[in-house]
């Protein structure tokens, strides 16, 4: 049976594992270092099989050997962002976690595609790529799928349309410098830039940029996990099924948009093995300047890694 492993059984990891097993295209292994947590959550999820009708199995474990032969490994492990904590402050702790996770995952699944969710995700995706030694196409991070989902929600509310009518385009860092591309964000096929004023577009963009922090402020003791897990599940499905679907993801760039040796959110075509193609949009001068500025923010984080 094909297998997908989820590393980390916190809110994002466990909800993702649930979403994946309900899609019923592969067995799911949920791994965590805390004994009992992945086992208990997996058992709970498995007891919904007769209700929902999925046939594949979900297993919880503390042993990386259980992940052997995974086609895709999703890395959610890391500490959650707390109120007032920046993504950069997560870096030192999550770098140590990522180093251990990548080593163990590839020991048992050397052919796996890595999907990185841990924050700060652009930098963690870069770190996973460097640690793994894998081709850049086999390492991808959560970015614009989530940010775009947030944007689509606010655009839909503003214009009174269904969120599914919005095709968002959010590029750059998954963080404060992310860039909403209004010309390439479509609402029923029409550019957002033609439907709202520049001021309104900026207002919607700021709401999307602050979407994660807004949730953290409400929750007090945690961060978002429903929309993030849904976003990652969509990415995993596109990779596993080889759909060729275009999504905005954190990808290793090698000349695209004039950038090299960096991970940044850009449109990519996902399929078997990870990224099949990086889509280069015809950005105008202002759009490109904003993307380059966002890249500079990520470069600062990457430079602080201990490699």
UniProtKB/Swiss-Prot annotation:
Active site positions: 174 (proton acceptor)
Top-level taxon in the UniProt lineage: Bacteria
The protein's UniProt keywords, in alphabetical order, are: NAD, Oxidoreductase, Tricarboxylic acid cycle
Q: Name one GO molecular function term.
A: L-lactate dehydrogenase activity
Binding locations of NAD(+) = 8-13, 32, 94, 117-119
Ranges annotated as spanning the membrane? none
Q: Where does substrate bind?
A: 81, 87, 119, 150
Reaction catalyzed:
(S)-malate + NAD(+) = oxaloacetate + NADH + H(+)
Give a yes or no for keyword NADP in this entry.
no
Query: EC?
Result: 1.1.1.37
GO BP, sorted A to Z: lactate metabolic process; tricarboxylic acid cycle
Mind telling me which SUPFAM superfamilies this protein's record contains? LDH C-terminal domain-like, NAD(P)-binding Rossmann-fold domains
Q: Which InterPro entries match?
A: L-lactate/malate_DH, Lactate/malate_DH_C, Lactate/malate_DH_N, Lactate_DH/Glyco_Ohase_4_C, Malate_DH_type3, NAD(P)-bd_dom_sf
Q: Which HAMAP family match?
A: Malate_dehydrog_3
Annotated NCBIfam families: MalateDH_bact, PRK06223.1
Described purpose of this protein according to its UniProt entry: Catalyzes the reversible oxidation of malate to oxaloacetate.
The family this protein is said to belong to: Belongs to the LDH/MDH superfamily. MDH type 3 family.
Q: What is this protein called?
A: Malate dehydrogenase
């Amino acid at each position: 049976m094909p297998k997908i492993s989820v590393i980390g059984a916190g809110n994002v990891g466990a909800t993702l594992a649930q979403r994946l097993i309900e899609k019923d295209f592969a067995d799911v292994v949920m791994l965590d270092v805390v004994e009992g947590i992945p086992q208990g959550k997996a058992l709970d999820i498995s007891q919904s099989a007769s209700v929902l009708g999925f046939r594949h199995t979900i297993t919880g474990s503390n042993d990386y050997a259980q992940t052997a032969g995974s086609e895709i490994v999703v890395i959610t492990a890391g500490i959650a962002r707390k109120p007032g904590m920046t993504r950069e402050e997560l870096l030192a702790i999550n770098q140590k976690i990522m180093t251990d996770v990548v080593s163990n995952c590839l020991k048992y699944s050397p052919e796996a595609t890595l999907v990185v969710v841990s924050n700060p995700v652009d930098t963690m995706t870069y770190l996973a790529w460097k640690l793994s030694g894998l081709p850049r196409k086999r390492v991808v991070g959560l970015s614009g799928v989530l940010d775009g989902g947030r944007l689509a929600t606010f655009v839909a509310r503003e214009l009174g349309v269904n969120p599914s009518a919005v095709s968002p385009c959010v590029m750059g860092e998954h963080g404060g410098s992310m860039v909403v591309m209004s010309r390439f964000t479509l609402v029923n096929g029409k550019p957002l830039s033609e439907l709202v004023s520049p001021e309104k577009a900026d207002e919607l963009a700021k709401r999307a940029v602050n979407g994660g922090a807004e949730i953290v402020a409400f929750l007090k003791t945690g961060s978002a996990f429903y929309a993030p897990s849904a976003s990652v599940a969509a990415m995993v499905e596109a990779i596993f099924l080889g759909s060729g679907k275009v999504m905005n993801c954190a990808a290793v760039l090698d000349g695209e948009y004039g950038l090299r040796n960096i991970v940044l959110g850009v449109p990519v075509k996902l399929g078997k093995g990870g990224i099949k193609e990086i889509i280069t949009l015809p950005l105008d001068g202002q759009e490109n300047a904003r993307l380059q500025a966002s890249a500079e923010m990520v470069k600062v984080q990457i430079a602080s890694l201990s490699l």
